A protein has these predicted regions:
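Conserved ABC ATPase "signature" region
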Residues: 68, 72-95
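Catalytic Walker B motif of ABC-type/P-loop ATPase nucleotide-binding domains
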Residues: 124-127
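Conserved catalytic motifs of ABC-family nucleotide-binding domains
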Residues: 120
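Conserved small/polar residues in nucleotide/adenosyl-binding loops
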Residues: 159-166
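Helix-to-loop junction immediately C-terminal to a conserved catalytic motif
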Residues: 20
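Conserved ABC ATPase signature
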Residues: 99-103
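Conserved ABC transporter NBD signature motif
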Residues: 28-36, 43-44
């Protein structure tokens, strides 16, 4: 488990956007396992699951549908999909077939983590993963992130709230 700490405006989210391919950098190189992300874009996207700060989920799809769509975007063969396992790990099984618009904020956060996991990346990057949630839910989310580590996934969290995030 790794953390990148810094005040608001320090560029933490920009780094995530560069890694995710939604922003370009001006100079320098970023390598993942020795591969330059600019020249090996597909491999780097497969290596990283990104959990954005914003609760970007489609309100008119169920969590299960969203995971299946995400798996399809990453060309995960149907036989290799583990959406039910991921829903269970993120404690979303009971809401798997409910419209996402009916999920609480904490459930939406967990759904974003699940979507980042669906293509089985070895690295998951969490951008302010507990923003806007209460202390009890924050603890539950961190427990889920620890589960990811036990599953062998390297987790990198970006935050400016160090004192509250452990």
């Amino acid at each position: 488990f790794y953390g990148l700490l810094g005040p608001n405006g320090a560029g933490k989210s920009t780094i995530i956007n560069i890694l995710g391919g939604t922003t370009t950098k001006d100079t320098g190189k970023i390598k993942i396992w020795g591969l330059n992300i600019d020249t090996h874009r597909k491999q780097s996207k497969l290596a990283i699951g990104i959990v954005p700060q914003e609760l970007n989920i489609d309100a008119f799809f169920t969590p299960k549908d969203q995971l299946e769509l995400q798996a399809g975007l990453f060309n995960v063969p149907k036989k290799q999909r583990v959406t039910d396992y991921i829903l269970e790990l993120m404690e979303l099984t009971e809401k798997a077939n409910s419209y996402s618009r009916n999920l609480s904020g904490g459930m939406r956060r967990r759904l974003l983590v699940a979507k980042a996991m669906v293509h089985n990346p070895p690295i998951i990057i969490l951008d302010e993963p507990t923003a806007g949630v209460d202390i009890e839910l924050r603890k539950k989310l961190w427990d889920n992130f620890k589960k990811l580590n036990k599953e062998g996934i390297t987790t990198v969290s970006y935050t400016h709230l160090l004192a509250h995030e452990t």
